[in-house]
């Protein structure tokens, strides 16, 4: 696993490349990620970096959090995230260090993880892209009904995992192999081609693409 960073979705825009083609991009703000803890095989049984970013009001910080941030010698952030490390990764990174967007300067593609927009309770047509039933020809009540959900007396039940109506969205989603269009180290911005999960101002985890 490669070292990733925590960012914030600013929104979408478009830029023009050298050929004059319009490229849709998502702007991700990646403020300095401050290392709050370095987990090791000896003490924790696995290797990882724990980071925070952003700020948090003093009256919103619990005493355990305050002690944890004080021990690391970093400003309290809006949350804590961990990045697993493979052997040989993260060597030399110590508690209190800052990781910035420039680590993506030589990266061509990234994977972006976020929480998708919540859609509430939705039917099968919106949630699973089911086809609608007949608009006419005797159909009066079942235009958007799911249809059959099983077989017969055997098996006599609905299988687990059957696609049906239910809560849609608000779940962890990863979009893979997004092309890095631009890295703006001065303004802490990363521009990637296409859309990323979640709403504006949502937290994102950006890592070098595993399938690149």
Swiss-Prot record:
<feature type="modified residue" description="N5-methylglutamine">
    <location>
        <position position="153"/>
    </location>
</feature>
<dbReference type="InterPro" id="IPR009000">
    <property type="entry name" value="Transl_B-barrel_sf"/>
</dbReference>
<keyword id="KW-0689">Ribosomal protein</keyword>
<dbReference type="GO" id="GO:0003735">
    <property type="term" value="F:structural constituent of ribosome"/>
</dbReference>
<dbReference type="InterPro" id="IPR019927">
    <property type="entry name" value="Ribosomal_uL3_bac/org-type"/>
</dbReference>
<comment type="function">
    <text>One of the primary rRNA binding proteins, it binds directly near the 3'-end of the 23S rRNA, where it nucleates assembly of the 50S subunit.</text>
</comment>
<keyword id="KW-0699">rRNA-binding</keyword>
<dbReference type="GO" id="GO:0006412">
    <property type="term" value="P:translation"/>
</dbReference>
<keyword id="KW-0488">Methylation</keyword>
<protein>
    <recommendedName>
        <fullName>Large ribosomal subunit protein uL3</fullName>
    </recommendedName>
</protein>
<dbReference type="GO" id="GO:0022625">
    <property type="term" value="C:cytosolic large ribosomal subunit"/>
</dbReference>
<comment type="similarity">
    <text>Belongs to the universal ribosomal protein uL3 family.</text>
</comment>
<keyword id="KW-0694">RNA-binding</keyword>
<comment type="subunit">
    <text>Part of the 50S ribosomal subunit. Forms a cluster with proteins L14 and L19.</text>
</comment>
<keyword id="KW-0687">Ribonucleoprotein</keyword>
<dbReference type="InterPro" id="IPR000597">
    <property type="entry name" value="Ribosomal_uL3"/>
</dbReference>
<dbReference type="InterPro" id="IPR019926">
    <property type="entry name" value="Ribosomal_uL3_CS"/>
</dbReference>
<dbReference type="Pfam" id="PF00297">
    <property type="entry name" value="Ribosomal_L3"/>
</dbReference>
<dbReference type="GO" id="GO:0019843">
    <property type="term" value="F:rRNA binding"/>
</dbReference>
